[in-house]
Design a protein with these regions (language model features):
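Short, T/G/N/S-enriched strand-turn elements that build extracellular solenoid repeat scaffolds
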Residues: 24, 31-38, 49-64, 79-85, ...
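Extracellular beta-strand repeat scaffolds in secreted/surface proteins
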Residues: 42-45, 69-73, 88-92, 107-112, ...
Length: 352
């Protein structure tokens, strides 16, 4: 800190660093091992910094440009095995790389470069901005990853966000996607929220985990988990295996869903599911106020415009025929329910 004038002059060439409390620069080709940043200290990394502990840079709130202090990884810079703790901030700029970072207790990582194998614990946060790539992030209890428009997260493992129950609002935990998320694994208590502009591809959801779709979800596999498709949300090519549920709410749409044995597709009134494949033992739960088309073991089936035809109900499946609506050629097998409301009509019902 004694060479403050020289440090200040060097900062003229540094990208996106506030001109306050600049304390150390790791030059290209230089390696620094260990150390602590606090009290608005800055570390500007063009070379390599290993094993730093950061507890400054977020005093003015998460992901705020008004903050000063923290670690700044420049183009070509590398940070490894960093611990970011209370009020700490690591900024990874375009061309910079951070690996094996642990973020906890209210610390955060702002990412326009590359982050590999980040772990988010107790209120640790990662913000993936436009151009940023996060790969292999693990989100543990009360951790949070925000993938902004133009950001990419790949191989994320989500273990938090759904502790309050399926499809509930747990605020800033789990993963929220405005950009792109690929090859995500959602475990028990994990939640991925895909916002209107967001896209999620190749997601695996296990029992106790869920995905809330307001944007687009492609190629999701439900191995006991839940997928909720909300108004204006779209899910394509979902596979529902044992214990999995796909729930299509009013204004939501899904296409090419496959329901396997002990899986369940629920389509609410005003929801739409097209090109469904219902395999033996798969359950369809819907009403004549929804739109559902596809194939089952009887052949083509449909529910649309108040008319249901060739529907198979089994293993928890249910069809509600509403007032003024009709159902024809319905097959009700073990565990299936056909509920014809007052004023509804069902003809040619066969029982298993």
């Amino acid at each position: 800190k004694g060479a403050g004038v020289a440090v200040a002059l060097s900062l003229a060439a540094v990208t996106s660093v506030p001109a306050l409390a600049a304390d150390s620069i790791v030059q290209a080709g230089e390696t620094v091992n260990g150390g602590t940043l606090e009290n608005h200290d800055n570390q500007i990394v063009f070379g390599t910094a290993n094993g730093m502990t950061i507890s400054t840079g977020l005093e003015l709130g998460p992901d705020s440009e008004e903050n000063t202090g923290g670690q700044w990884i420049q183009n070509g810079g590398i940070a490894g095995n960093t611990t970011v703790t209370t009020n700490g901030r690591q900024v990874v700029l375009e061309g910079g790389t951070a690996s094996d970072t642990v973020i906890r207790d209210g610390g955060g990582q702002s990412l326009n470069g590359l982050a590999v194998n980040t772990t988010l614990n107790n209120r640790g946060e990662q913000w993936v901005h436009e151009g940023g790539v996060a790969t292999g992030t693990i989100i543990n209890r009360d951790g949070y990853q925000s993938v902004k428009s133009g950001g990419l997260a790949t191989g994320t493992i989500i273990n938090t966000g759904a502790e309050g129950g399926p499809d509930s609002d747990n605020s800033y935990t789990g993963q929220k996607v405005q950009g792109t998320a690929e090859s995500t694994t959602i475990n028990k208590n994990g939640r991925q929220i895909i916002l209107f502009s967001g896209i999620a591809r190749d997601t695996l959801i296990y029992a106790g985990g869920d995905q809330s779709v307001h944007g687009r979800a492609l190629n999701t596999t439900l191995n006991g988990g839940y997928q909720y498709v909300h108004k204006d949300g779209l899910a394509l090519n979902t596979v529902i295996n044992e214990g999995g549920w796909q729930v299509v709410k009013a204004g939501g749409a899904v296409g090419n869903t496959t329901i396997n044995q002990n899986g369940e597709l629920r389509v609410h009134a005003g929801g739409e599911a097209t090109a469904v494949t219902q395999n033996t033992g798969g359950a369809l739960v819907t009403s004549t106020a929804a739109t559902v088309t596809g194939i089952n073991r009887l052949g083509a089936f449909s529910v649309m415009e108040g008319k249901a035809d060739n529907v198979v109900l089994e293993n928890g499946g249910r069809l509600d025929v509403l007032t003024g609506h009709t159902a024809t050629n319905t097959r009700v097998d073990d565990g299936g329910t056909l509920d014809v409301r007052n004023g509804g009509t069902a003809t040619t019902v066969s029982m298993g």
